Amino acid sequence: MQYNFDEIIDRRGTDCFKWDALQAMYGRGDVTPMWVADMDFRSPDFVMEAIRHRCDHEVLGYTMPSEGYWQAVTMWLEKHYNIQATKQELHFIPGIVAGIAYALLCLTQPGDRVLVTTPVYPPFLNLPKDSGRTLVCSPLRITNGRFEIDFDDFERKAEHCKVFIMSNPHNPAGTVWGTEVLTKIADICEKHNVLVISDEIHADLTLPGHQHVSYGTVSSKGITFMAPSKTFNIAGLGSSVCYIADEALRKRFFGWLDALGVAGGNIFAFTAAEAAFAQGGEWLQQMLEYLSENVKTLDRFLQERMPKVKVVLPEASYLAWLDFSGYGLTHEQLKHKLLNEAKVALNDGTTFGGDKYECCFRLNLGCPRSILIDALSRIADAINE
């Protein structure tokens, strides 16, 4: 079956955060949203069919994950993550941000230091502070157009931390951390008794030519979170999975989750995830090929129309990191041009790690190519004016 990712679907009026929160978040609703990290593609037909079939029963009582669900999850992890997990090593989580918050509350104490590498997904900056922990940032370097970890700085700071929250692949920009990098992280963190929490929500979206390596295959001493939400565009269903190989850590954290009643999810989270993992291979392959062409389109466009923009192109997922500092504009001038002249809503780089990133913006290219090209054209016209 050939899937149509060029189809334009009007998401407005569905309480869609990406489109319907524009007025509240940006002060105007007449802009193209290229911010929130979900895609504007139709959710797969086999997922929608499974949900409709479950609805047809017309009794939506308390539910539990079926054996079919666990089988689909474990088979997917083995095929795509090279993780041979037992059901006992896995735990359902209603969302990865919530899962990380649970881990911090369960496994650390108020005041403990939590390490992140910036720029990074904004909740990683907020979770430690909001839970009474101390945030520690190790800035990434950009070398040859991709993010790299400054391991000298990383180890100096890790020595005094209890937890490292890692985005693997990295958000923003979808940098894929290879085996060598992950092994070095594991060595440093085990040396200093730092727990690694690996958010791998973008892992399935690793683009052709790159290979995702799960932290769970490098070390048994960490917590790995995965989800079908980004992969199959079903983030609104709240479905993710936690994997822990180490028995002592697993018993402590999973026992805490069970005490909170976290094991239960909504009916459609289980139904959709099972269908996605069991039937989603071909859809995912075609979608990744489409995203890869979107990345190439962005790269060509920037070279031709906005050569002063420095970009970190995604190796996984659909999020690019754009640095407009070459235009000599202030943060406020850039925001005005992008929002009010180009009429495009991007993620402000300062939310990923502070004023150091005031000329940077994250762009979501998980959309039909015609929308991407139109938005880029308007950005170029505004910036080059």
Question: What residue ranges belong to the model's regions?
Answer:
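N-terminal small-domain helix-loop-helix segment of the aminotransferase-like
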Residues: 2-95, 102, 276-277, 385
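Helix C-cap/helix->beta junction micro-motif
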Residues: 131, 191-192, 342
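Active-site phosphate-binding strand-loop segment of PLP-dependent enzymes
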Residues: 140-210
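Active-site PLP attachment segment
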Residues: 217-252, 265, 359
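Structural signature of PLP-dependent enzymes
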Residues: 251-257, 276-299
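Conserved glycine-rich beta-strand-loop-beta hairpin in the small C-terminal domain of fold type I
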Residues: 274, 290-299, 311-324
